[in-house]
């Protein structure tokens, strides 16, 4: 075998070649206006690290013997370590302004320009992958061939699913990223709509702000001078043109635009079918979007076992919580009624979550054909229940078809 060439297989050869080619293309695409990586906003202040000379490293990152010292000892001159932690820092540097992680929920929240939306589509992972693409740009701006090769090779390793998951996992605890449920939607008088944030106390509109920490959105455009003749006519019709009932409904729905729960009460809307009560509250629920939701009647009805904590979690952040159809003669659970209207903190959890608590913002509306029964005659309990009668039979086309058609946007319509 002496003197004969030996072909030693290098399994990483083609990956390194491809990475270097990508880095070279990225270098060619950089414009003269692009600053070096180390000079870009959000990079580290290198005064935080020991001078390279004290570590036996020159300004190219090389030593006389062995691999470049910055591969695992100190952050390189252009940015972060070539480690999973370094990638987490890259992610936060590039996208941290728009990312928060709620540990009790185990969920990322992403700023979408209007609110902090829970990540249900993998947006956090997409941003992590974009961060890896940025490593190739780091390679393009490297000060030496050694740096370029090291960065290109590391970028390939970072494309593994396990490396992406590790980047996100480490980033969850980085400063400024963790957030608790109590900090979200904390101002009960702010209402997020498509064209800004409304202060419900003053009626003023301003731009969306990250600092408000709002997670909800009402999918409508706020116009304080808008008129609603169809809505007004509908209220007149289903409430028998009674000014007292009409005024009450307007006040109650306005109250439901806020997170204020100081009235400590709920509404029971009752009456036989086709009287407009479900159309009224379902239409309003669609108008306020994320601020409204349905809850199971097991939250309110007397039963052998206490309601599951996941049912209480559905109340979090709601301003209108609708419960429907309890059946004739069903008993309301007095302790649940008091608990859910008291304004006290509520403990809850979702599946595979630890318990967490929240300040209530919901107003309960139960609509049913038959008013439920309450066993007690205690005045304190009955004071929490406001009965709203719907006595008139409304034409089906008006209550169930015409009103939604005029009030709510449908696909492919202007």
Please identify what each model-predicted range represents.
Residues 1-74:
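Glycine- and charge-rich intrinsically disordered segments
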Residues 197, 327-328, 369-374, 391-395:
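Conserved nucleotide-binding/hydrolysis micro-motifs of P-loop NTPases
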Residues 50-220, 395-396:
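Intein modules and their embedded homing endonuclease domains
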Residues 295-308, 335-354, 397-409, 413:
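Substrate-gripping "pore-loop 1 plus following alpha2 helix"
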Residues 310-317, 349-367:
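AAA+/SF3 P-loop NTPase mechanochemical coupling elements
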Residues 319-343, 356, 374-381:
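Conserved AAA+/SF3 P-loop NTPase catalytic/coupling segment centered on the Walker-B
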Residues 358-361, 377-414:
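Phosphate-sensing "switch" segment of ASCE/P-loop ATPases
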Residues 99-122, 148-149, 183, 190, ...:
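P-loop NTPase catalytic core of nucleic-acid-dependent motor ATPases
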């Amino acid at each position: 075998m002496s003197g004969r060439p030996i072909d030693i297989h290098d399994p990483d050869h083609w990956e390194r070649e491809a990475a270097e080619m990508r880095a070279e293309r990225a270098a060619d695409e950089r414009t003269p206006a692009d600053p070096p990586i180390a000079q870009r906003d959000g990079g580290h202040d290198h005064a935080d690290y020991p001078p390279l000379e004290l570590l036996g490293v020159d300004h190219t990152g090389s030593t006389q013997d062995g691999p470049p010292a910055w591969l695992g000892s100190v952050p390189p001159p252009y940015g972060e370590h070539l480690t999973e932690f370094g990638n987490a820092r890259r992610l936060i540097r590039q996208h941290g302004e728009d990312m928060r992680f709620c540990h009790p929920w185990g969920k990322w929240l992403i700023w979408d320009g209007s609110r902090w939306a829970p990540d249900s589509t993998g947006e956090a992972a997409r941003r992590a992958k974009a961060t890896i693409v940025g490593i190739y740009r780091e390679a393009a701006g490297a000060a030496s061939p050694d740096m370029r090769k090291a960065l290109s090779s590391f970028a390939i390793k970072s494309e593994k699913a396990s490396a992406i998951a590790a980047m996100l996992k480490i980033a969850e605890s980085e400063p400024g990223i963790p957030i608790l449920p109590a900090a979200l939607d904390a101002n009960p008088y702010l209402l997020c709509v498509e064209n800004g944030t409304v202060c419900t106390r003053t009626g003023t509109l301003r731009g969306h702000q990250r600092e408000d920490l709002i997670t909800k959105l009402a999918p409508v455009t706020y116009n304080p001078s808008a008129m609603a003749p169809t809505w007004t006519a509908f209220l007149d019709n289903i409430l028998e043109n009674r000014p007292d009932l009409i005024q009450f409904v307007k006040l109650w729905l306005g109250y439901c635009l806020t997170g204020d729960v100081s009235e400590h009460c709920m509404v029971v809307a009752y009456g036989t079918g086709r009287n407009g009560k479900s159309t009224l509250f379902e239409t309003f629920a669609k108008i306020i979007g994320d601020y409204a939701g349905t809850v199971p009647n097991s939250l309110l009805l007397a039963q052998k076992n206490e309601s599951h904590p996941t049912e209480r979690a559905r109340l979090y952040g709601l301003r209108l919580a609708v419960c429907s159809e309890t059946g004739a003669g069903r008993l309301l659970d007095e302790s649940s009624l008091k608990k859910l209207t008291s304004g006290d903190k509520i403990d809850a959890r979702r599946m595979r979550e630890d318990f967490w608590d929240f300040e209530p913002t919901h107003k309960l509306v139960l609509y049913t054909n038959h008013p439920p029964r309450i066993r007690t005659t205690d005045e304190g309990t009955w004071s929490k229940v406001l009965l709203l009668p719907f006595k008139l039979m409304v034409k089906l086309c008006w209550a169930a078809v015409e009103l939604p058609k005029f009030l709510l946007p449908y696909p492919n319509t202007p």
